[in-house]
């Protein structure tokens, strides 16, 4: 009898581990169990890892999908989804759990589209960036009067207003000249941000992310950078001046891909507001400083948009299945957008990888860099481009590239070491005919002239 009971309990445990994700709200412990359940179902293509802890000590868990989990494969792009940045905006969290189960199940069912996506892409899913805030919101539940309860982290900070402000620097550089990518962090940045923000920034430093989406609630629209308005003039009710990035057309296309694959976002009229094509420039909607999507673009190689996915910030459980069906195709199509533009390796004469080489596209004032393995990824719309690769100590290389509408174009660069140019010593004629007087080097000459100016006329 005890043997039968043991077998029954084992089968019950096994059933709990492989049961599909249900359409309900998952508290922190449920979320963790769900992530490990998916890993148990698909151990060959998944990995659960933590990028840090929240203020109250909860792990910020990520579920990775890859045919080689835990390993970066050169020329395979990295893409991420971030959910539940605002603790009371719960739909993104649940969609990420449903997406995780869907990818696992469809891979096991040999759905060729999903198999190819996982073989060609390294996908990172962070269901909850703000688990502390979620627990506060979940304790209140949906349809309660506290609209903003649980929005912030445990220290009362809005995490989407907590990243270092790099927009101020890029707007200055665009006007007066300066770097157009990978803007440095302030020296004291760690003391200015919350633990959750710090963890995400370190996560960005650990992976060469190419594409990302940040899932929110309270509206239905695909929002693209910049979020912070360059001009603070108001152009209508709740509207400020549009502030496009150098990649504005590309960002619009990424936003439209999600909007038109979504069940109803593309219609424009949602939640009492109207957005043509279901998309908006962030600053055109309202100006937001220290946001995450602008930070991605200005500090890393990553192109991120913000997805507002539901009128209700914390929708009732009976709406979750409808929301999943409305977002499923859009979530997959957006992941597939990482496979466009150009990609390749940057190598030296001996075929060694060159990290941190700068890839520039003529006419687009935003560069990207090669990763630690020497591979780079540059999202571009179809067209003909002039592309250059540069690295300190090497001669630049420039090529003309045709980008098609489907797969990315492979463009490798082989950079040769620069040969130092030695300037010949210039000599001036002496005042005496036929005799040349030796002159000082240029730096010494300038120094003597400066001293003469300081002394004044003799």
Curated annotation (Swiss-Prot):
Residues 24-338 form the Peptidase M14 domain. It is an enzyme of class 3 (hydrolase). Disulfide bonds join 42-104, 271-311. Residues 1-20 form the signal peptide. Synthesized in the liver and secreted in plasma. GO terms for molecular function: metallocarboxypeptidase activity; zinc ion binding. It catalyses: Release of a C-terminal basic amino acid, preferentially lysine. Its EC number is 3.4.17.3. One of its GO terms (biological process) is bradykinin catabolic process. It comes from the Eukaryota. SUPFAM superfamilies: Carboxypeptidase regulatory domain-like (SSF49464), Zn-dependent exopeptidases (SSF53187). Keywords: Carboxypeptidase, Disease variant, Disulfide bond, Glycoprotein, Hydrolase, Metal-binding, Metalloprotease, Protease, Secreted, Signal, Zinc. Zn(2+) binds at residues 86, 89, 216. Glycans are attached at residues 400, 402, 409. Residues 423-458 are annotated as: Disordered. Protects the body from potent vasoactive and inflammatory peptides containing C-terminal Arg or Lys (such as kinins or anaphylatoxins) which are released into the circulation. PANTHER family: CARBOXYPEPTIDASE N CATALYTIC CHAIN, PROTEASE M14 CARBOXYPEPTIDASE. Tetramer of two catalytic chains and two glycosylated inactive chains. It is linked to Carboxypeptidase N deficiency: An autosomal recessive disorder characterized by angioedema, acute or chronic urticaria, and hay fever or asthma. Affected individuals have levels of carboxypeptidase N below the reference range. This is Carboxypeptidase N catalytic chain. The lineage of its organism: Eukaryota, Metazoa, Chordata, Craniata, Vertebrata.
């Amino acid at each position: 009898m005890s043997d039968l009971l043991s077998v029954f309990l084992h089968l019950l445990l096994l059933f709990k581990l492989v049961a599909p994700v249900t359409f309900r709200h998952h508290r922190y412990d449920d979320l963790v169990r769900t992530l490990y359940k998916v890993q148990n179902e698909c151990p060959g293509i998944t990995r659960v890892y933590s990028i840090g802890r929240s203020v109250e000590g909860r792990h910020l868990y990520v579920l990775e999908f890859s045919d080689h989990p835990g390993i970066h494969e050169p020329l395979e792009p990295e893409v991420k989804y971030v959910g539940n940045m605002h603790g009371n905006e719960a739909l993104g969290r649940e969609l990420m759990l449903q997406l995780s189960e869907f990818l696992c199940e469809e891979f096991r069912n040999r759905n060729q589209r999903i198999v190819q996506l996982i073989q060609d892409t390294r996908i990172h899913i962070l269901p909850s960036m703000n688990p502390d805030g979620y627990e506060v919101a979940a304790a209140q539940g949906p349809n309660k009067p506290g609209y903003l309860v649980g929005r912030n982290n445990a220290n009362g900070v809005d995490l989407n207003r907590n990243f270092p402000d790099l927009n101020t620097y890029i707007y200055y550089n665009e006007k007066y000249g300066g770097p157009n990518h990978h803007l440095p962090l302030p020296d004291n940045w760690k003391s200015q941000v919350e633990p959750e923000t710090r963890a995400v920034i370190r996560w960005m430093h650990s992976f060469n992310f190419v594409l990302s989406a940040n899932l929110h609630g309270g509206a239905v629209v695909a929002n693209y950078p910049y979020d912070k308005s360059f001009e603070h003039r108001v152009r209508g009710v709740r509207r400020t001046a549009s502030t496009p990035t150098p990649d504005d057309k590309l960002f619009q296309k990424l936003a439209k891909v999600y909007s038109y694959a979504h069940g109803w976002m593309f219609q424009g009229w949602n939640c009492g507001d109207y957005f043509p094509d279901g998309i908006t420039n962030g600053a055109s909607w309202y100006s937001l400083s220290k946001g995450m999507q602008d930070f991605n673009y200005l500090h890393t190689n990553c192109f991120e948009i913000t997805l507002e996915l539901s009128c209700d910030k914390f929708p009732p459980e009976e709406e979750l299945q409808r929301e999943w069906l409305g977002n499923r195709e859009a979530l997959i199509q957006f992941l597939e957008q990482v496979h466009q533009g150009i990609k390749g390796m940057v190598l030296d004469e001996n075929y060694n990888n060159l990290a941190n080489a700068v890839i520039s596209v003529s006419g687009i004032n935003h560069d990207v860099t090669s990763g630690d393995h020497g591979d780079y990824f540059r999202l571009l719309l179809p067209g003909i481009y002039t592309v250059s690769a540069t690295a300190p100590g090497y001669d630049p290389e420039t090529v003309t590239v045709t980008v098609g509408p489907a797969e990315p174009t492979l463009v490798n660069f082989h950079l040769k070491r620069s040969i130092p140019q030695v300037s010949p010593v210039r000599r001036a004629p002496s005042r005496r005919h036929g005799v040349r007087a030796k002159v000082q080097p240029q730096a010494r000459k300038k120094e003597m002239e400066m001293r003469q100016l300081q002394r004044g006329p003799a």
